A protein has these predicted regions:
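Dinucleotide-binding Rossmann-like beta1-alpha1 core, especially the glycine-rich loop
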Residues: 56, 64-117
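Residues forming the flavin
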Residues: 1-80, 122-464
Length: 464
């Protein structure tokens, strides 16, 4: 089978590139492949009460139509530069902001609209001032929260639109290889069940998301495609009583606060705050980390957020992914395949937590399928020091987060995929192959991943 465009990965980057292509040119023959399942078939066994993680491959939470974001809490950050996302590396600031606005319009078209945060800009500015007085930095971002419980139906809406326009969607298609025979002839080999298929495309868009980062690196190594190693962020998922943070989260849903630690001078930040949310496991095929999400309709009595410290390696080893995986595997050895939970008091006092002490606390854990243990046995001393010092400083901004009963789950690791070297349209030099989204190191959240899809699609549209 021959196609004008083959898109590998049906996450935000892949979906938005397909949308842009078929909307602007209805004659294009497009195939969209994903190693995971369609929205209706993305069923995690843990959805049934009492069922532990089955280590499915592919993981229904991370892979499938909509990407890893489908079962996230659906926070949309409308900003061109945040964390590992920086669209201004590929275009001017004004063009990046315009692109973000265009991305928002498409989200809105498919009902992915919600109340805008900060809900009160004057109060948000006062909060930022309070953070600055405490010696830290608050980044104000235009945000919308869609909720984990509503995202699947929105993603289904995009998929229905694409299929109605003639895009071929192929689920559970595990791409094995991409072979370039000429600039405009590429052979994509994928496995579906026990069968192996080969399809041909004039243009290839590679967008397998975070779970495809390792595969992209293997592909780059195989064909000599240059890439740059990037930093990672390592830390914990912090869980506190919801009312402790409501004064801030009612105004700024997901406050991103940057803190400089004293001992090492490192930067640690809050990230992915979930008011009334739930701590969740994240399966990386071989090891388990933690994450968090929030539903639109169902709320817990707690709020959780990531508290992560940036790690950059220089020489002789620059492979930060391998470093992060090593920490995760140590945690899984100690937790017997499960994340570790520890009270802040126990971490400070240098003793492992036990469930009978955690259960006596004032915070009921929202993730029970974990092991009470000692995070100091998992993470380097430097990371633990940053967490403890960071929480002390954060307590000056949000009193109560440094309480003894505060719960810490670990490890939380934000892998920054190696960045494939491309031109500013994300295209390789001598082939019509594009690398976009999180897995290619070009984006780090739902909105910027979607934006990279628009850029690649528009470059293809100019040439077809």
């Amino acid at each position: 089978m021959k196609y004008d465009v083959i898109i590998i990965g049906a996450g935000p980057a892949g979906l938005f590139s397909a949308y842009e292509l078929i909307t602007k040119n209805k004659k294009l023959k497009i195939a969209l492949l994903d190693k995971g399942s369609s929205v209706e078939h993305r069923i995690c066994p843990m959805n049934k009460k009492g069922v532990p993680c089955q280590n499915c491959n592919p993981c229904a939470i991370l892979a499938g139509y909509g990407g890893a974001g489908t079962f996230s809490d659906g926070k949309l950050n409308f900003i061109p530069r945040l964390g590992k996302s920086d669209l201004t590396k590929y275009m001017s600031e004004s063009d990046a902001c315009k692109l973000i606005d265009e991305t928002e319009e498409i989200f809105n078209k498919f009902k992915m609209d919600a109340d805008v945060y900060p809900s009160n800009m004057d109060e948000a500015i006062e909060i930022r001032k309070k953070v600055a007085i405490a010696g830290s930095k608050l980044l104000l971002i235009k945000q919308k929260h869609l909720g984990s419980d509503h995202l699947p139906e929105y993603i289904q809406g995009i998929c229905d639109y694409l299929e109605d326009k003639g895009v071929t969607l192929i689920e559970r298609a595990n791409v094995i290889d991409i072979k370039t025979e000429s600039e405009t002839k590429h052979l994509v080999t994928y496995e579906k069940g026990k069968k192996s298929e080969v399809i041909e495309g004039k243009n290839i868009i590679v967008a397998p998301g975070r779970t495809g980062a390792k595969w992209i690196q293997e592909l780059a190594d195989k064909y000599g495609i240059p890439y740059l190693s990037q930093s990672i962020e390592i830390g914990v998922r912090v869980e506190v009583r919801r009312d402790i943070m409501e004064d801030i989260t009612n105004i700024i849903y997901d406050p991103t606060i940057f803190i400089k630690t004293d001992t090492y001078g490192d930067e640690i930040r809050t990230f992915c705050t979930n008011p009334g949310g739930f701590v969740a496991k994240e399966n990386y095929y071989g090891y388990i980390c933690v994450n968090g999400h929030a539903l639109k309709d169902l709320k817990s009595n707690n709020t959780n957020f990531a508290f992560i410290s940036k790690v950059t390696l220089t020489e002789p080893v620059t492979n930060t992914r391998l470093y992060g995986e090593s920490i995760a595997r140590i945690a899984n050895v100690l937790g017997d395949g499960k994340p570790i939970i520890q009270s802040l008091k126990d971490l400070r006092n240098g003793r492992r937590s036990e469930w009978h002490r955690i259960n006596k606390g004032f915070i009921e854990p929202t993730l029970k399928d974990c092991v009470a243990g000692d995070l100091a046995l998992v993470m380097p001393h430097r990371i633990i020091t940053n967490i403890l010092e960071g929480l002390e400083k954060l307590d000056k901004i949000i009193p109560g987060v440094n309480n003894d009963d505060t719960l810490l789950y670990g490890p939380e690791i934000k892998f920054f995929s190696n960045e494939i070297q491309t031109d500013n349209n994300f295209k390789l030099e001598k082939a019509n192959v594009y690398f976009i989204g999180d897995g290619a190191g070009k984006a780090g959240n739902i909105v910027t991943a979607a934006a990279t899809g628009l850029v690649a699609a528009r470059d293809i549209l100019e040439r077809v």
